[in-house]
């Protein structure tokens, strides 16, 4: 028997049909496997009861590509955070965020993150490696399995910078759409901005939402918060965003984490409105998503008072900027990106398998 496409998770319907034929099976076995992989969420080929028993036994050593849940924490608002252990022992986080009408998954794209944003728990842990296709898809299947309902929305806002793993992330977006059945317009990719990558993304013919993490209205402050911003001037980033919106026809969401006394003053709101004016005047559609900070032990930043948040909103609206405030979920369960992994490693008496 020839080697299968490994891992199986991440393979397209056509590839699975071809593989089944290579194994001497009818092509419809590949269709069945596709259904069991992406819609039933199997963790072992032994679960595919529609396969002949002899073939199941021959396939028993073939890994599907699922990760192990090593920790699950549910917050009072129903948000569930998962710590997943990959085949090499690395640890990543994913979050399931339910509401009455939707189930959103916040997925990671890297183990750690090289961007080193100084208010972010993931940025404090350093960078280990890019995630593989099956490791991204597995996060969505894990949440579906746990909640017992279909995932409707996916946001690439977990650990890592998606555009530094761009090819695999775009593969994952297409698979989420074609294999799992999540509409591209229900998928959001968040980036702090990587030179030349937003223009590249604009050429990929996707219908996703792009969320750009600004976090500051001027270059000096942005470099203090996001060291990598030194290599991507704010004016150039905004220009690339404007071109992306005009090319794709899709609205961009500008993410802005409010840090008490750091970037939440009235002058910052006015600077932000002025910064975005150059994009909106060109006919581009944009939206600002304000995120009151979720404090972490590794950084000395605080959450702003609600009255400060309300004033920031008022000033942006006064300058005709569309704005909303994100409802922060999972505050009681270390739901900020990177917190669960960090606390788990600190509490572990020995390193996770595969780690030095």
UniProtKB/Swiss-Prot annotation:
Q: Name one Pfam family in it.
A: Radical_SAM
What is any one of the record's Gene Ontology cellular component terms?
cytoplasm
Q: Which family does it belong to?
A: Belongs to the radical SAM superfamily. RlmN family.
Compartment annotation: Cytoplasm
Q: What protein is this chain from?
A: Probable dual-specificity RNA methyltransferase RlmN
EC number(s) in its UniProt entry? Answer: 2.1.1.192
CDD domains this protein is in?
Radical_SAM
Q: Which Gene3D superfamilies match?
A: 1.10.150.530, Aldolase class I
Q: Where is the Radical SAM core domain?
A: 99-332
Q: Name one GO molecular function term.
A: 4 iron, 4 sulfur cluster binding
Specify the domain of life of the species encoding this protein.
Bacteria
Query: Binding positions for S-adenosyl-L-methionine?
Result: 160-161, 190, 213-215, 294
**NCBIfam families given in the database record:** rRNA_mod_RlmN (TIGR00048)
| The reaction(s) this protein catalyses | adenosine(2503) in 23S rRNA + 2 reduced [2Fe-2S]-[ferredoxin] + 2 S-adenosyl-L-methionine = 2-methyladenosine(2503) in 23S rRNA + 5'-deoxyadenosine + L-methionine + 2 oxidized [2Fe-2S]-[ferredoxin] + S-adenosyl-L-homocysteine; adenosine(37) in tRNA + 2 reduced [2Fe-2S]-[ferredoxin] + 2 S-adenosyl-L-methionine = 2-methyladenosine(37) in tRNA + 5'-deoxyadenosine + L-methionine + 2 oxidized [2Fe-2S]-[ferredoxin] + S-adenosyl-L-homocysteine
Entry keyword set: 4Fe-4S, Cytoplasm, Disulfide bond, Iron, Iron-sulfur, Metal-binding, Methyltransferase, rRNA processing, S-adenosyl-L-methionine, Transferase, tRNA processing
Question: What's a GO biological-process term for it?
Answer: tRNA methylation
Q: Which HAMAP family match?
A: RNA_methyltr_RlmN
Q: Where is the active site?
A: 93, 337
Comment field (misc) = Reaction proceeds by a ping-pong mechanism involving intermediate methylation of a conserved cysteine residue.
Per the UniProt record, the source organism is Synechococcus sp. (strain JA-3-3Ab)
């Amino acid at each position: 028997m020839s080697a299968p496409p490994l891992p199986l998770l991440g393979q397209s319907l056509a590839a699975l049909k071809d593989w089944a034929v290579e194994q001497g099976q009818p092509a419809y076995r590949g269709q069945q496997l596709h259904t069991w992989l992406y819609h039933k969420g199997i963790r072992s080929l032994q679960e595919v009861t529609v396969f002949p028993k002899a073939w199941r036994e021959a396939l028993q050593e073939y890994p599907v590509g699922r990760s192990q849940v090593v920790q699950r924490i549910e917050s009072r608002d129903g948000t569930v955070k998962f710590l997943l252990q990959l085949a090499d022992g690395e640890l990543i986080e994913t979050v399931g965020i339910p509401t009455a009408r939707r189930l959103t998954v916040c997925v990671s794209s890297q183990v750690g993150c090289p961007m080193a944003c100084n208010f972010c728990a993931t940025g404090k842990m350093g960078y280990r490696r890019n995630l593989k296709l099956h490791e991204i898809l597995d996060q969505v299947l894990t949440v579906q399995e746990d909640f017992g309902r279909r995932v409707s929305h996916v946001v690439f806002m977990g650990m890592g910078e998606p555009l530094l793993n761009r090819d695999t992330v775009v593969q994952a977006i297409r698979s989420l759409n074609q294999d799992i059945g999540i509409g591209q317009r229900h998928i959001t990719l968040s980036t702090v901005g990587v030179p030349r990558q937003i223009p590249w993304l604009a050429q990929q013919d996707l219908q996703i939402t792009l969320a750009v993490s600004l976090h500051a209205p001027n270059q000096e402050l942005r470099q203090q918060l996001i060291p990598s911003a030194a290599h991507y001037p704010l004016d150039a980033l905004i220009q690339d965003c404007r071109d992306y919106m005009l090319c794709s026809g899709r609205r961009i969401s500008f993410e802005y984490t409010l840090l008490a006394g750091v970037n939440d003053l009235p002058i910052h709101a006015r600077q932000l409105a002025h910064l975005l004016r150059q994009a909106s005047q060109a006919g581009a559609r944009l939206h600002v998503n304000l995120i009151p900070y979720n404090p972490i032990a590794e950084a000395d930043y605080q959450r702003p008072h609600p009255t400060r948040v309300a004033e920031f909103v008022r000033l942006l609206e006064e300058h005709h900027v569309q704005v909303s405030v994100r409802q922060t979920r999972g505050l009681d369960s270390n739901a900020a990106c990177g917190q669960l992994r960090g606390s788990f490693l600190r509490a572990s008496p020995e390193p996770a398998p595969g780690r030095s």
